[in-house]
Amino acid sequence: MADSLDHAPAQANNLPQFLALTIGAIGVVYGDIGTSPLYAFREALRPFGPGGVGRDEVIGLVSLVLWTLTAIVTIKYVLFLLRADNDGEGGTLSLLALLLKKGTKYPVLMFFAGVLGAALFIGDAMITPALSVLSAVEGLKLVAPALHDYVLPISVVIILLLFAVQSRGTGAVSVFFGPITLVWFLMMAAAGVAHIGDDLAILSAFNPLNAIGFLWNAGLIGFIVLGAIFLTVTGAEALYADLGHFGRHSIQAAWFAVVFPALALNYLGQGALVLSHPDAISNPFFLMFPNWALLPMVILATAATIIASQSVITGAFSLIRQAIHLGFLPRFEICYTSETQTGQIYLPLVNTILLTGVLALMLMFGSSEALAPAYGVSITGAMVIDTILAFEFVRRQWGWPALTAIAVLLPLFNLELVFLGANLLKVHHGGYVPILIAGTLITMMWTWRKGVSVLREKTARQDIPLSQFMAIVERKSEHAPVQVPGTAIFLTATPDTTPAVLLHNIKHNHVLHQHNVIMTIKTARVPYVPEKDRYTITKLSDRFSLLELRFGFMDDQNVSRALARCRKEGFKFEIMSTSFYLGRRKLIADPQSGLPQWQDKLFIAMADSAIDPTEYFHLPANRVVELGEQVII
């Protein structure tokens, strides 16, 4: 596996590389938003009912779609937020890490905002596969109405296969994601162009006054419809989250050259079709195609939704890894499915949780029409969070005056709040799902941070300063521990105090190695740490040294590889005569700990689910010694 420097944020050095990144971005970054035409316009028409939508309403709806895409995606994400990066990386937690690193007047507020945004994204990662795959497979009902009862079983099988292959990695097939999705966008554009001529009046949708007029005249229905209109921009947050994988210029080029034109043309075509054939309101996307093309389009749509689902699953894996490295969650097992790309990862526990959630949603709601109301809440919430974090970013990082930041971001913030309000109206129709998912994840992150803090406070009462300990053991006395040859490395989170495992080793084994290394692992609030800054070695005495290893929150925390680098640069030790000492704590709940009993139990359960540090840090298992202790928390 290559070093982290090989996985710095993507940059194109020549035209072929730029085109490759741009096509790749079309598949990964825009897969989600590219499947929205399957259901978004249909859902916007649904409140009017068959025959209840007039010409002005159709034109107004399409105008709303076009200007929502312009305001939210083009202006906020493509032109603005893509510039707000953390050493080339984007995403909610990446932006939060940068704000915490630079300093903010509201660290607690920013922390909870960032955690909420991340939690809402996980809700999106469950809803997107369920909704998009169902909406694609439902096209079979137009091909053969007799297949109606098979839509859900077929969708479930596709989801099962999708999650089953995650452990094998997607590197071999991911090269096809971009070309397949490019074909999908071209077909959508062609279908739109073919139907715009059905009623050229649809072109007046480019006039924003039609969108404003629709909202003014539609009243409550117009407000309700905004929740469905927002479905057209679901997936926009992926632009920001995938910034490090493809680079700003490639993502922008893909949007302006392919994605935005294709989406605009398709929505215009759907609108023109409904103007000329009002009965097409039932499924305007698939009814754009002649009967002979329906089956190929269902197959292509299914492929596109699988790619979109894969993108959010990969995004969820990446986000949880960031949360682990930033200390928001315990260390879950992380498997690397590529020898060359550290971004291709697989988290077995997260995969199982996502699969369970997706299947539960599909079986609970049964159709894309029933599930669609659940979708908008998580996306609008995540986008509002991005705007809040962006406001603090431009103030702290770019030095914008408060009035300038307000003038730029307040209109977008107000627009997103309106969309959020419209989506909250659908809470009882399924909008509660992402709220429950986000609430669960926030509770877990908060419990973990609070539990770790309480645990550190309890252990700190028994800590012995490292300098004091060294002075004691280096005194010559009959009670001094026996010196044995070799090197011992003691892993600790607090390098100024004596590791508990070192104290237990002397207490039970009465020995001290010839060379003792106190090793601490720090996660920097940057995505990647250069190899030249990976470690610092400080000699404390003839027998003790302090080794600090530093990793970014996107780095693979491979301690064995880092130690090999140290050895090349003069840190003298032999791996086969080195023992790694790790402490294993057995946590016992204490009603007087300061945590509620339910939170005590949740924290202990999360700690028990964490992967063994030996495996997580890639330590040589045959050189690891674990000593346990009970801690009442």
UniProtKB/Swiss-Prot annotation:
Bilayer disposition of the protein: Multi-pass membrane protein
Record field: transmembrane: 18-38, 61-81, 107-127, 143-163, 173-193, 211-231, 255-275, 287-307, 345-365, 371-391, 402-422, 427-447
Molecular-function GO term, any one: symporter activity
Cellular component, GO annotation: plasma membrane
Location of this chain's protein in the cell: Cell inner membrane
Catalytic activity: K(+)(in) + H(+)(in) = K(+)(out) + H(+)(out)
Family matches, as InterPro entries: K+_transporter, K_trans_C, K_trans_N, Kup
Keyword set, alphabetical order: Cell inner membrane, Cell membrane, Ion transport, Membrane, Plasmid, Potassium, Potassium transport, Symport, Transmembrane, Transmembrane helix, Transport
One Pfam short name: K_trans_C
Functional note: Transport of potassium into the cell. Likely operates as a K(+):H(+) symporter.
Family: Belongs to the HAK/KUP transporter (TC 2.A.72) family.
Name of the protein in question: Probable potassium transport system protein Kup 2
Species the sequence originates in: Rhizobium meliloti (strain 1021) (Ensifer meliloti)
